């Protein structure tokens, strides 16, 4: 049997911080809108909150005709589009969906729109396999599944992914297979806040991290299987078998997510948890805050950084709809408790060497669901959290980065000196992949 390949080497990442939490529109409207004061005391049109979710968010309910056909159409486009420009979010309203096999390709997010994963049930599967790459799953990147309950047709759901492909807030009423058909190589992976009633079978997976979840058993390990706060996890036994197990997760927070409250879209922002074990939703409604969509600037392709920054300064949160966003100035988030949530692997590219995102040394900013892709002009940094020498105590309400990914090259020439700099204290980094391309275009 061949040994699995070594995973791609990540770019240099400088994390300057005293304490890290555990873990790894387009144009402002000019008519009939409120006004705001500019820095020079002038009246400026305010950026409106709310609105529709744009063309790349596909919303389904149980009565939608030919759901399988639409899902298959998107998968056909995205199955092998590793460095493509399309982005998609498949959103399912609460209810029961029969005979669904949602195959998930690159830059595709599938999610339920309930407050609890059990609100949206598939009598079927959410599948990732590796047929496009001859059974090798080591390049199954950049996709996600969230907030659904699955009754797999065969009794076991297949989620054969590698990096940057989270499985969050999922309830699988059966088993979960993390390997591709044929047990080819795979280099995952991440599960959080999920309940797997049956066994999880990594099989050919090189490594995996599972956090604050519940499993009915764990079959094997190859290099390292890591668990924190997981009910049913195997006992700590590294290196043979290669299980690293913590009974609880010292500090964690679940990722914000979009949901429907009746007919109204809201974003739920979970509370910080201490010494967590098991899922956050076991008793029904999780602890946290619901924010109406009209308190968000719904960012769509074509939006510029100036408008995004104006929205934040005005007091709005940010919801990036699926798309690719080219910016010519830094997105600055200096207001405490701001949520910046991306759908469908929303991608930010700094075109002229600026830092893509800077977060101030403030409490409780939530960055989630974003891919920052280095541009052709070198950026000294791509993401910064807090200025140099930041020293404020944020332990009661830390900033968090969740499913925030960085890429340098692959989709084209990309240059950056340092990917992520964390200067603020107490920051929670919950699932990231910081990748300097070893294939594609513009790498090396």
What are these regions (language model features)?
Residues 31-46:
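C-terminal region of N-terminal signal peptides and the immediate post-cleavage residues
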């Amino acid at each position: 049997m061949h040994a699995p390949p070594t995973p791609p080497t990540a770019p240099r990442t400088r994390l300057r911080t005293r304490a890290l939490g555990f873990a790894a529109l387009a144009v402002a409207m000019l008519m009939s809108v409120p006004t705001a004061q500019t820095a020079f005391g002038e009246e400026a049109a305010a950026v409106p909150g709310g609105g529709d979710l744009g063309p790349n968010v596909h919303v389904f309910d149980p009565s939608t005709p030919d759901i399988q056909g639409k899902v298959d159409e998107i998968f056909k486009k995205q199955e092998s589009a590793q460095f493509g420009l399309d982005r998609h979010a498949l959103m399912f309203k609460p209810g029961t969906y029969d005979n669904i096999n949602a195959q998930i390709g690159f830059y595709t997010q599938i999610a339920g729109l309930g407050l609890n994963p059990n609100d949206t049930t598939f009598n079927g599967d959410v599948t990732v396999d590796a047929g496009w790459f001859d059974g090798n799953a080591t390049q199954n990147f950049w996709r996600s599944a969230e907030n659904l309950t699955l009754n797999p047709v065969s009794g076991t759901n297949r989620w054969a992914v590698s990096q940057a492909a989270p499985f969050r807030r999922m309830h699988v009423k059966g088993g979960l297979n993390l390997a591709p058909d044929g047990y080819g190589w795979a280099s995952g992976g991440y599960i959080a806040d999920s309940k797997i009633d049956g066994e999880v079978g990594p099989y050919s997976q090189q490594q995996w991290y599972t956090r604050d979840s519940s499993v009915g058993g764990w079959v094997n390990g190859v290099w390292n299987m890591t668990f924190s706060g997981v009910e049913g996890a195997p006992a700590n036994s590294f290196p043979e078998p290669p299980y690293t197990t913590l009974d609880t997760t010292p500090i964690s927070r679940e990722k914000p997510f979009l949901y429907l409250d009746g007919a109204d879209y809201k974003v739920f922002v979970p509370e910080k948890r201490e010494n967590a074990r098991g899922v956050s939703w076991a008793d029904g409604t999780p602890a946290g805050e619901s924010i109406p969509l009209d308190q968000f600037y719904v960012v769509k392709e074509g939006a510029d950084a100036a408008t995004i920054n104006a929205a934040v300064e005005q007091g709005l949160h940010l919801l990036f709809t699926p798309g690719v966003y080219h910016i010519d100035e830094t997105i600055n988030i200096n207001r405490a408790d701001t949520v910046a949530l991306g759908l469908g692997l929303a991608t930010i590219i700094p075109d002229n060497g600026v830092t893509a995102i800077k977060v101030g040394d403030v409490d409780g900013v939530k960055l989630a669901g974003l891919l920052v892709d280095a541009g052709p002009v070198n950026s000294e940094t791509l993401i910064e959290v807090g200025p140099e020498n930041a020293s404020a105590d944020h332990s009661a309400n830390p900033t968090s980065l969740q499913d925030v990914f960085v890429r340098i090259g692959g989709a084209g020439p990309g240059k950056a000196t340092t990917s992520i700099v964390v200067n603020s204290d107490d920051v929670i980094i919950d699932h990231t992949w910081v990748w300097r391309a070893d294939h594609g275009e513009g790498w090396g």
